[in-house]
Amino acid sequence: MVGRFVMETLRGRDLLSIADLSRAEAEYLLDLAAQMKIGKVAPQCPKVLGLLFQKASTRTRVSFTVAMYQLGGQVIDLNPQSTQVGRGEPLTDTARVLDRYLDAVAIRTYGQAELQLFADYARIPVINALTDREHPCQILADLLTLRESFGTLAGLTLCYIGDGNNVAHSLLLGCALLGVNIRVASPPQFAPLADIVAQAKALSGGKSEVAVLTDPQAAAKGAHALYTDVWASMGQEAEAGDRQPIFQPYQINDHLLALADPRAIVLHCLPAHRDEEITASVLEGPQSRVWEQAENRLHVQKALLASLLV
């Protein structure tokens, strides 16, 4: 069966980028997450997951922990400040020790290079739980939410408005991988990285739109989903005051939402700053799917862990 074949290809793998997945593998994970969400599939995975987080986390930490518990496994929280990593032990040494204790590790760190270095030395699955470059688990949840809302991903357009950050990068890659039209509207100086855009265009194979714009209204026109994130990510708090006037025209509000498809949904990876990147009326409005989107982190990560570890 195709599903079983795809699970076999995922077993023991790393997920450092959404582009590490084939289209069939990504679709399989969404299907499995949807089945797990309604209780149709409940694999047991009595393994141990380590969480090595150098950045604050609510949804990612809790959803990974609950997912592992629901699979019958256990979680160890590895705060860098309470391990030898915080005292300067080389990451390569830590990786080679932890892979003898753990069955997988999810890492939230600043640099993608640190994540890659750990994965190079660890023999267990390494999962990107967020870096400054990408946030692949978030995007799996986003795509599941989009598919739930419309019944399909075919022919849909997702419009991301705001900072061309890690979420924008993974949205570009994930949407291109699954054939969803993706538009990103950012101030020119905060556009997504050029190499990510080029990679997304290559993944799309010219079969779906991959567009980077500076005009949020043009980007939002006719879109099936409007998506935003904070204007200053973790580690950029000192820049928030300078960024605010630059990003103000990129706020998702009722006016911008009116330009989208009448059935459009609103997404935000959270935490949200109400009346900054998104107005409270839109965040709490009838087209918002933000809370469903947050819930879906649990289901896609449970599907991912089961596929990598069972």
Curated annotation (Swiss-Prot):
Chain residues that bind L-ornithine: 166, 229, 233-234
What this protein catalyses is: carbamoyl phosphate + L-ornithine = L-citrulline + phosphate + H(+)
Q: Which InterPro entries match?
A: Asp/Orn_carbamoyltranf_P-bd (IPR006132), Asp/Orn_carbamoylTrfase (IPR006130), Asp/Orn_carbamoylTrfase_sf (IPR036901), Asp_carbamoyltransf_Asp/Orn-bd (IPR006131), Orn/put_carbamltrans (IPR002292), OTCase_ArgI (IPR024904)
Documented EC number(s): 2.1.3.3
Give GO terms: molecular function aspect only.
amino acid binding; ornithine carbamoyltransferase activity
**UniProt KW keywords:** Amino-acid biosynthesis, Arginine biosynthesis, Cytoplasm, Transferase
Its GO CC terms?
cytoplasm
So, what pathway does this thing act in? Amino-acid biosynthesis; L-arginine biosynthesis; L-arginine from L-ornithine and carbamoyl phosphate: step 1/3
Give the PROSITE patterns listed for this entry.
CARBAMOYLTRANSFERASE
The residues listed in the UniProt record as binding carbamoyl phosphate, with positions renumbered to this chain, are 57-60, 84, 108, 135-138, 269-270, 297
Question: Where is this chain's protein located in or outside the cell?
Answer: Cytoplasm
Source organism superkingdom: Bacteria
Q: What is its main location?
A: cytoplasm
Q: Does the keyword rRNA-binding apply?
A: no
Instruction: Tell me the Gene Ontology biological-process terms attached to this UniProt entry.
Output: arginine biosynthetic process via ornithine; citrulline biosynthetic process; L-arginine biosynthetic process
Task: Read off the PANTHER family from this record.
Answer: ORNITHINE CARBAMOYLTRANSFERASE, MITOCHONDRIAL, ORNITHINE TRANSCARBAMYLASE, MITOCHONDRIAL
Q: What does this protein do?
A: Reversibly catalyzes the transfer of the carbamoyl group from carbamoyl phosphate (CP) to the N(epsilon) atom of ornithine (ORN) to produce L-citrulline.
Family label: Belongs to the aspartate/ornithine carbamoyltransferase superfamily. OTCase family.
Q: Under which name does UniProt file this protein?
A: Ornithine carbamoyltransferase
Q: Which organism is it from?
A: Thermosynechococcus vestitus (strain NIES-2133 / IAM M-273 / BP-1)
